[in-house]
Amino acid sequence: ENLKSKNQDSKVANQINTLKEVLGYVDVKGSGLLIKIDAINDEIGNIANFVDYNKILLNIVNEIKVNGGEYISINNQRLNQYSEISLAGSHININSTPIAQPYNINVIGDIDELTDYINKKNTYLDSIGKNYQLKVETKIEKNITIEKMSIINKLEYIEGE
């Protein structure tokens, strides 16, 4: 009976820890993928308007999630289900924090799926490198740390009558 109770407590503790990781409340470490996106040359200048108009960061995040990415940050801004990627003037905001190029995307996830993803041709990453004046660099990395969110989402609920 006591052993059963300890197992249930352990199971609940694991679920809580997993939830904290997914929500971005704790740092995560693991293997994954590093992606760097920048203008091909300095003459192009600020690419924020261009990147936002074409929803490039949003499309990359979605494709990464489908291909094994579990935890993602862009320029050290941790993403979770409440994160927003939006244009604000001449820069992009993530989690209401302005970020600038180059866009460094860190991904932790299934290393085999992520490796297969970057080795495939005709991925979205390939297309932005070919179709836009952007330089895309990718690298598989064994030791990646993605820090917890600096601003924890405060959920507010509307009270009913």
Residue ranges and their predicted role:
Residues 1-37, 45:
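Juxtamembrane "stalk/linker" segments
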